[in-house]
Every structure is written in structure tokens, then in C-alpha cells.
Amino acid sequence: MNTFPLFFKLEDRKVLIVGGGDVALRKADLLSRAGACITVLAPSISHEIQALLSDSKHALIYENYNKTYMTDSRVIIAATDDETLNHQIHSDATALNIPVNVVDTPHLCDFIFPAIVDRNPIVIGISSNGKAPVLARLLRARLETLIPQGYGKLAKLAGEFRGDVKAKIPTLTGRRQFWEQVFEGKVSQLMFSGNENEAIAQLQADLDNTAANITAKNATDESTEAQNTMGEVYIVGAGPGDPELLTFKALRLMQQADIVYYDALVSPQVLDLCRRDADKVFVGKKRSNHAVAQLGINELLVNSAKEGRRVVRLKGGDPFIFGRGGEEIESLRSHNVPYQVVPGITAANAAASYAGIPLTHRDHSQSVRFVTGFLKAGAPNNNFKSFLNTDETVVFYMGLHSLPRLTQGLIDAGRSAKTPIAIVSNASMPNQQVLTGTLASIVELQAQHQLPTPALLIMGDVVSLHHDLAWYNNKKTSENDNNWLRGGTATTPKPNPNQQAHALSMIANLATEDGGLEQLVID
């Protein structure tokens, strides 16, 4: 973000507005709602401003601008139609280290007035950083229709009970869970329907019941207490990287989490959607360097749940497609930890859709197979002969690292060297790249263009459709007969080395014990 959103306390603080017309009126109206003591400085001040600021706490000064009036001002607003004067006001305020806003001149603003949704004490500010104020206002209009007015009353009610809740519920986690139940339950519905007295009574009853349960729990033995405080684990598929491809359920659980254990293939954009104050722990793995071994991850999930925490295990793609989600829930079951599994869009689906390569097509492919492309050193390529079916699409996960061995093994097994194959890098992301060729040419093409990980391979006749069906980031940057590169060139900025290393985190996990190819066939 280019500007940081802050909420400024201006109650009983001096604010200087230079200008007395309609623009000054709009700013004065907003600032007066925040309780500011407003001084308007202008040789002529509109009747509307005079009426708005009739309270004695405000001051109207009918004079030309003079920087001496800046003294003790918390913020300054330049709202004149004189460009030279506005620059002077900005210069004087800057010299005095006072934040200044020159209306409709973003480069002279230390702060920006956002579009505001006011449900006092709940306030939402929306800003385009001065780039598109009309768009910000349109977003505000949408939010106004989505957020009931009752949220303000609900927040005030919570403020009145805050002290009692803190006294009766000793733990931070317990208080947060209590308030979430209040805001998502009967109390909020009563408030939104206008039954304020009933809402107050319901909140008091909920608090009394919770306090009684805490007292009863403290009187039991440790085993009962541990059972009562058991949390829950959510195994969540984060999808391929584009946050718009998350499911609603994934987003909801991510925003409820107390702690998030995430893999290397979870994009920063998706991770940012988790609850802000949740603990975020990286447990990704890369070849021969695991941040946390799988058994350690299993133990972390169990222990966090036993602490009463809501745990999100966030995995790139889908948890049950080469993601070890099954191993993790086996561990959870053995410890009687409740869990949920939220599917995600797996990389194969995203890469195919965003590259314009249908995985099945009546004229080209009647089935699709998902296979891990990583081979252990020296492992026999016994499975390659199973990939000779030309009316089948094969998707190799994590195949880029072993691309030369993979393509040569397929050719040696009898697959035509002219078989179309594509590399899709950073599928669904703005820096997505697609490189197409054949089994015979793709290794040399990859050496030339250096598409980065994370990437997967799609092999089969359907790859030939990419030429006509590509739609996303559809910039053709290289063409040589049937070889295509879309979405970038060799000079395209690559992720930083740490991120590239993290992208390999799943490779070691996906190699089978016998060194063969692990696979999933969908007919």
C-alpha cells in the first residue's frame, strides 16, 4: 500500500481550514462530526459554514491567510481555489511539521480524506490514494447497502459490557471467542431487528452462562478441562495463488483462525487474507532443507488444537492432491482432534484453465492423469510405459526440476518425441508464463527462457489448443513454428531466491518411497 490507514483522534483538537467556500464546507462537515475545534480562515465565509460552525468551540476569522494562525493546529486543510496560495500553505505547514491536506492535489497531501462508512463507533475508510476518488465513493455506496445501521449500536453495547467480559472471562482467546459468538448469534439479530432491550438481556445471559461454565470447568480434573478446551483444525486448500480463486468457506475459516501453519506455495496475497492478529507459522519444505518435518507439522497441529486454538493448515492447491492432507488428518484422528477439510482449486485445473489448455476434449483427450514429476536419484523409470496413451492428458506436478530425465524417459518408453507439452509457471498469477513445445524440444526451450518455479507440465494433444484458446496474460513474446512463450520473456522479473526455494518445498514430500511416480487417474 502507498499510504497507511490511520484513524486520527481530533476531538477538542484545533483544525485550521483555509478557505470559506463549498470545498471548505465539505471538509468542515466531516471534521465537526469527529469533534474537532475548527478554525476557518478566509476573507469571505459562506453562510452554510457559519451555520455549521455556530458553536463557540469553533472560530471564523475573516482575514487573508497568515501562517501565524497555524499555531497549535493538529492538521491543516488548504481549500482555496488559489493554486499559489495552496502551495504556500503546504510549504508553511511542512516547515512546522503539521500534517496538511491540499484539496484535490494529492502530491501536496500528507493525508487523504477517505470515503467514509459511518456506523459510529464502527468507521470504515476507503481510499484510492487520490487516484480514483469516484471509484472509492462507489465502493462506499456498495458497503452502505451491505452493512446494517445496527452495527453501530451493537458496537456501543459491546463497549458497555467490555469491562464485565474481561473480569469474568480471564483468557484473551476465551474473550475473543465469546465476542465472536455474540456478534454472529442471537444478540446481533435482536439488535438489528430493533429489539435493543432484549439484546442487552441476551448478552447478559450469555455472559453469565459463559462465566458459570468457566467456574464449573475449573472445578473438574485436568482431563475434563483438556476435553472442554479442545480446539479444531481446518485443512484448507489455498488454491493456485490468485486470492479470487479461494472458496468462501476457506476465506471464512482463515479469518477465524488463531494460528495459521502455511506452506511455501501459499501466495502472499492469500496469506494476507488471514486474520490479522493470527499467528502465522511457515512450515514449508524444500529439497534437503525442511523448515519443519512432516511429523513435526502433525505434532504442531495436534498441540495447537489441544490448547483450544482454531488452527488453519493452509496448503497451496488442494490438500488431497499431492498435499499430504490425508496424513495430517490421520494424525488428528488418532488424537481425537476435530477437523474439517476445505478443498481448493488444484494447480492442474488452474494452470490448464488460465493457459487455455482444456484437460479433456472430445476430439483430443478422454481422460486426465495427475502425476508427480519428481524422481529420486537413480530411480528406475518403470512407470513411463503407462503414459503411451495418446488420447489422455498427463499433468506432471513439480516436474520442472527433473524435466530432462522426465522427457527422455517418456521418449525412451515409446512416446513420440513430437508429443506436445507445455510448462505453466505461476499459474493464475499476474506473472504467469506458458511455454509450449514438444518432448524433444522443451528442455532446450526451458534452458533458453528459464521459466521459474512453481510450475507444472501438461502433456498431450490438448496442448495444441493453447495457440487459439489462450486468454489470460495473453502476450505472445516468442514464436518459432509450434513453440510459444506467452506472458513474459527471459527478462521477466523472477521471485526472490527465498521464494523460489520455498516453491520447491513440496517436492521432497511427493517422491514415493520406491522412487517411482505417484499418480492419480481421472477417467
Curated annotation (Swiss-Prot):
Reactions performed catalytically: uroporphyrinogen III + 2 S-adenosyl-L-methionine = precorrin-2 + 2 S-adenosyl-L-homocysteine + H(+); precorrin-2 + NAD(+) = sirohydrochlorin + NADH + 2 H(+); siroheme + 2 H(+) = sirohydrochlorin + Fe(2+)
KW Lyase (keyword) present: yes
Domain of life: Bacteria
BP GO terms, sorted: cobalamin biosynthetic process; methylation; siroheme biosynthetic process
EC numbers for this chain: 2.1.1.107, 1.3.1.76, 4.99.1.4
Phosphoserine: modified positions: 128
Location of the region described as Uroporphyrinogen-III C-methyltransferase in the Swiss-Prot/TrEMBL record: 231-523
GO molecular function: NAD binding; precorrin-2 dehydrogenase activity; sirohydrochlorin ferrochelatase activity; uroporphyrin-III C-methyltransferase activity
Active-site residue numbers: 263 (proton acceptor), 285 (proton donor)
Keyword tags: Cobalamin biosynthesis, Lyase, Methyltransferase, Multifunctional enzyme, NAD, Oxidoreductase, Phosphoprotein, Porphyrin biosynthesis, S-adenosyl-L-methionine, Transferase
Annotated S-adenosyl-L-methionine binding sites: 240, 316-318, 321, 346-347, 398, 427
Pathway(s) where this gene product acts: Cofactor biosynthesis; adenosylcobalamin biosynthesis; precorrin-2 from uroporphyrinogen III: step 1/1; Cofactor biosynthesis; adenosylcobalamin biosynthesis; sirohydrochlorin from precorrin-2: step 1/1; Porphyrin-containing compound metabolism; siroheme biosynthesis; precorrin-2 from uroporphyrinogen III: step 1/1; Porphyrin-containing compound metabolism; siroheme biosynthesis; siroheme from sirohydrochlorin: step 1/1
Residues the record lists as binding NAD(+): 22-23, 43-44
Alphabetized HAMAP family for the sequence: Siroheme_synth (MF_01646)
PANTHER family noted in UniProt: SIROHEME SYNTHASE, SIROHEME SYNTHASE-RELATED
Protein's name according to its UniProt entry: Siroheme synthase
Lineage: Bacteria, Pseudomonadati, Pseudomonadota, Gammaproteobacteria, Moraxellales
Name of the gene: cysG
